[in-house]
Amino acid sequence: MIITTTGCHSRQEPKVDITPHHINLQADSFYQQAMTLMESSYDVDSTRKCIRFLDKALAIDSLNPDYYGIKAKLLSEMGELDSALHVQTLAMKKKAITGEYLFQLGLLQAAKDMYTEAHESFGQSRAFLQAVLKQYPDSLGAFILAEAANALYEKEDSLFMRDIDEIRKRFPERLMEIEMTRRVKPHSLVN
């Protein structure tokens, strides 16, 4: 007599760690210089100088997601999508990435027609951001990004808000932001 057993396998969300990265003060001083310059000047030379500051920060602390994310943002703003994609891909390989930056990586991948990789990044972003929302349910920024990641993961071009009345109750002081954001088409972020 042969007895076979089958187990129930439930689909579990991937385990994500949203513990904030420990700040290295020496690296952070370069990051803060980059941020100050980035906020005060928008020319190409200043942007390049910001990137050099971020490179110095990364040389000291190669696991801080913000250093990679801001560097990728600056590179993409300069039209250097391949370089931005390389930076965020490296961050992902080092596990120096957050839900926000996984979303950024997905956008960069989609812009380079890497749709399978983008789909995976949006799914990972969604999982990270849902974990953030469990711990910080009042974070509108994480909520909006999670909904955008979900829309792009599900290949929809409608930004969230299935129950708009409930969302308005959840964020009563942010109604203008909600109304402006819900009109964004997630696929327009890729093009």
Language model features: what each stretch is:
Residues 55-59, 89-93, 126-127, 133-134, ...:
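Conserved structural position within tetratricopeptide repeats
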Residues 28, 66, 100, 140-142:
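Start-of-helix register in tetratricopeptide repeats
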Residues 39-43, 77, 111-112, 151-153, ...:
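Register position in tetratricopeptide repeats
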Residues 23-60, 70:
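Alpha-helical segment of the N-proximal tetratricopeptide repeat
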Residues 35, 39, 73, 107, ...:
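Residue-level recognition of tetratricopeptide repeat
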Residues 11-15, 137-191:
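Terminal, low-structured helical/coil segments at or just beyond the last alpha-helical repeat
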